[in-house]
Amino acid sequence: MKMKKMHLIINGVQRILVVDPDKSLASVLREQLLLTGCKVGCEAGQCGACTIVLNGKAVRSCILKMSRVPDFSVIETIEGIGTPDDLHPLQVAWMAHGCAQCGFCSPGFIMSAKVLLEENPDPTREEIRRWFQVHRNLCRCTGYKPLVDAVIDAAKVMRGELKKEDLLFEPKDNKIIGTTYARPS
């Protein structure tokens, strides 16, 4: 097994890694860097749970071998787009629309939608559906309406038409029962 030294920028941090060129990008992210938000469902590029952003493009990392990742690539994963105190508009919209029933597909959908909104800041419902079809993002729990609704609302936030707070539930009596915890990836 011949190892390969790579320079990558992952979630804004420059990294020097020694990788097996035959390993998938998903394996390297999950096993070497412990970025487990990149989910591996099918290992065949069919479900989209492993979608990350590579040099500005949504890619299915479970089928991308490290030998095909260019040196000095810029990689974004779900861990790099928001913080517990400052979530990305897509993450807020995902919560607001109840998009994460089991949550397994959410990181892949969010990363895919992030690229969509960078390329098209005002997509139609049909453009969003088509994007998810072309990029093979699948969800077996929610159906797709809440996912499309979330992308529409996140786009409004990113265009400045809404604030993130506008998407969140406000109880009428100003009381929420229970405790809020940051959800791990």
Model-found features: residue ranges?
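Signature of N-terminal electron-transfer/Fe-S-associated modules in redox systems
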Residues: 1-185
